[in-house]
Swiss-Prot record:
Superkingdom, natural source: Eukaryota
Gene: MYOB5
Name the UniProt record assigns to this protein: Probable myosin-binding protein 5
Biological source species: Arabidopsis thaliana (Mouse-ear cress)
Subcellular location: Membrane
Residue intervals passing through the bilayer: 20-40
Function: Probable membrane-anchored myosin receptors.
Biological classification of the source: Eukaryota, Viridiplantae, Streptophyta, Embryophyta, Tracheophyta
Amino acid sequence: MSNRSFKNFIEEELGTFPQFLIYALLEWILIIILFIDGFLAFFSNQIAKFFDLKIPCLLCTRLDHVLVSRNPDFYYNDSICDAHKKNVSSLAYCHVHKKLSEIKRMCEGCLLSFATEKETDVDTYKSLIGILHKDLELLIDDERELQLAFPVAGSKKDENFYQVENRTNNSNDRFQRQQRCSCCGQIMKLKSDKPKSNNQSFFGAPSPSPRVSFNQRTLDLSNIKYTDLPEDDDALNTKGASLDAVDDRTPSFVKGGNKFFGIPLSDSAQNSPRWSVRSMKKSFVDQNGLESEVLDGDSILQHLNRQVRLDRKSLMDLYMELDEERSASAVAANNAMAMITRLQAEKAAVQMEALQYQRMMDEQAEYDQEALQSMNGLLVKREEEMKELEAGIEVYRLRYGLLREERGEAEEFLDEETKPVSDLPVCSSNHEEDLEQMKDSAEDSIGNNGVMIIEEEKENGSRKDMLVKEISEITERLNAIESKGELLQQISDVLDVSEGEAILLQISQNLHMLRSFIEMPTES
């Protein structure tokens, strides 16, 4: 079963008639499925067209490449019938207009857009033109006809041939005037109506043009059309007249050029062999008859056509190279602009980050400065208070003098109060005990001083009121010092250990000095 197809299996196992019935049923099922698929495709296309959406592609919307791995040949050969294959094979893609059009009715611009994008061989291009039945007139839009005829006076066959040829050319001209490009819709050829006289246009040679010399090498070689003549006995005598007519005629300068590239053909013709070189060869034509002349003329036309194609090909290569350079420069410019924008974004980000850090540092510096200023203010206040206390003590000493007490108590007080500073406790945890001791000693001294002052008031009643006031002031100052001791304790917690200890030691020294000054006995 694996080596046989389904059709062969049914035919061998069931026979011909069951095979016919089964395949008829399968075909009806397939037709129904195709009708459903076609209706859905039509409905989707109508929806896309109604809402101005992009029309879905027939090949992209298939799920074969997702569900099953398919060979690309399946889509282009097996899935398309013979009739549509013929239609598709006659179409070509225009890279300019992004359209599929009939290749036999495409203009030069649309044709060259696909014929020279990847193919660089001249022979391939020539074969393509031959396949498409394109003559030289259809490839060159601005051509003008220059007939090379070999007439003989009094020849009726030539006159009949000329009349038939005129009728044929007129009909072809009318047809070509109406022919338009299948892609862009432009007229493929616009031939100007040229008035023709009786016999002078055919038999007579035109006078040389005084404006353009023969050595200027500005011939429009693409405007030559060769007319075949029948080979008979009368035509054998036309050799001399035809050569004279060709040598005496001066080619006319034709303006315009390649409309697709916008460059005149005369510019490309300057780099190619000239008609003057080939005209010298025609003087050496053999005297064997008209057949050799026909062959020589045909070879000249072929060579000229080949040279025109080569020049066009070189121009197209140059333009393609120019386009590549432009695209490369555009890509480089885009990359440079992207790099510049990225660098600018990075620079802006770095600047923003630097500004943020700078603001943070400024705020931190301001906060630290405020803290330092507040601490300096507190220290200044404490110093001022200490100075005020010292000034008050000095005033008291100057006004009342030193208080007297017993010798033993004074010595004991001095021994206690004149201890060195290094003997005082340093640990911050014992500051409260020191302050309490100082408070008790100060109260004791105040009490002793009060007793001493009362005794002195008994002796000196005149100074009683003054001493009471001074004692009350000293008591208030001691209470203030006690309240400030708590504040100093809080400050010691905030400050560093070394600074707090130093301040407390200094305060304790000042308090001891104050007490010693207050209770110091007079030695005089």
